Amino acid sequence: MDLEEKLEEFIEKMEDEEKSKATIKKYKANINSFIEYTKGKELNKKTVKEFKNKLDTVDEFLANTTNGYLIILNKFFKFIDRKDLCVKIIKQQKRFSLEYSLSKSDYHRLLRMAKKRGQEDNYLILRILGETGIRISELEFFKVEAIDKTMSIRNKGKEREISVKLDLLRLLRKYCRNHKIKSGLIIFNPDTKKSYAHSTIYRRLKKLAGMARVNKEHVHPHAFRHYFARCYLETYPSDIAGLADILGHSSIETARIYTKLTNNEKELKL
């Protein structure tokens, strides 16, 4: 079976279903990673499990990130009539612990290092992620025309509003002036004029963590959402519903995990 050919057919189906460009891009990248891994190997359940274990042990992958890969792969396997290859997803709480959380001191060390190195774009990315709780993929909604105290974020077919603090608002406007950005994306690859690949941002922040002597395991795809959530709950400890709304969680129970993290931190201080 030619998996690359099947992938093209699968992507065509996703386009017919009017999936967003970001979703299709993610599907293609994730399935391509699996195809690369399987080269020279037999396509069977054992190989899929080995790939799953590989994802589960890489520093930058937490359970929810690994599950994103597995859900996409399972969908692809069903498309090619290989349901026998489908694997179980990982329980979210398995690795969602304080061990992988970004502390306030870590966050501010990253900011100081980005500023010290003159990395204006990394500094701005850190400020946006840490102060709004958006996903890295949602940076594309930060456009010159949209800069305001309240901004709309659309993801997974849902729209939500986020608040932008005045000092961050000023920083965004100053950045645009200094870099002569008059319209469109604020954070973008200067070579392609398009959004940075998510993996590029992860790598850059990991590298920055090394420079700042911050544990790289604490700088993962959702580290800054976790950080924002815990800071929010320190200020509004009983407003889990409000936090769920800001983060775009459909269930309050999903946001409740951050309460557990905050309680764990309190226990460590005793």
Report the location of each language-model feature.
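Conserved catalytic core of the tyrosine transesterase superfamily
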Residues: 1-270
